[in-house]
Amino acid sequence: MLEADNVWFTLLTMNTNPIHFDAEYAAGTEWKKPLVDSTFTLALVTGLSVQDVSEHGVNLGWKEVRLPAPVFAGDTIRAETEVLAKRESQSRPGFGIVTVRTRGLNQRDEVVIEFERSIMLEL
C-alpha cells in the first residue's frame, strides 16, 4: 500500500482527520506516523476477496468490523475468507445467501481488519 493511495482515498472521501495525511501531526501520536484510513482498509480487503467469494454476487452488508492493528503506508495486505453459513433466499427464488468472515493480514501476519459480510448469489 502506497502513501499516495492513502492520501488520495482520504481526500476523495473527504476525511479531514490529519492522522491520515499530516506526517507532522501523526508524529505526535502513539503511532508516530500516519495511519491508513480504516475505510480504505475495509475497501481494499473486501476487494481482495471478491474474485474468490463474491465476484458474481451482491454484497448485502458488513457487520462486526474490527480493526485490531493499524495499517501504515508500505504495508502489504492479504485477505483470507471463511464461509460461516449458507442458505436459500426466502424472498428471491433461485438465489442463496452466504455469510463469510474475512480477515486482512499484514506482512507480519497480524490481523489488521476482520469483518463478516453477507452476499446474495444466484444458485
Language model feature labels by segment:
Residues 32, 68-69:
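Short, surface-exposed secondary-structure edge patches
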Residues 62-67:
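Short alpha-helix capping/helix-loop boundary micro-motifs
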Residues 71-76, 80-123:
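HotDog/MaoC-like acyl-thioester-processing domains
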